[in-house]
């Protein structure tokens, strides 16, 4: 359960970073 949440956070972080870098 915790691992799933952590993976979700990491994925969200990458998505945000990718969006900011365009």
From Swiss-Prot:
InterPro entries reported in the protein's UniProt record: Antimicrobial12
GO cellular component, one term: extracellular region
Keyword annotations from UniProtKB, A to Z: Amidation, Antibiotic, Antimicrobial, Antiviral protein, Cytolysis, Hemolysis, Immunity, Innate immunity, Lipid-binding, Membrane, Secreted
Record PTM Glycine amide, positions in chain: 22
GO biological process, one term: killing of cells of another organism
Compartments (UniProt record): Secreted; Membrane
Tissue: Mast cells in gill, skin and gut, and in lining blood vessels in the viscera.
Membrane protein topology class: Peripheral membrane protein
Pfam families noted in UniProt: Antimicrobial12
GO MF annotations, alphabetized: lipid binding
Described purpose of this protein according to its UniProt entry: Antimicrobial peptide with broad-spectrum activity against Gram-positive and Gram-negative bacteria. Rapidly inactivates both channel catfish herpesvirus (ED(50)=11 uM) and frog virus 3 (ED(50)=16 uM) over a wide temperature range. Has hemolytic activity.
Family assignment from sequence similarity: Belongs to the pleurocidin family.
Protein name: Piscidin-3
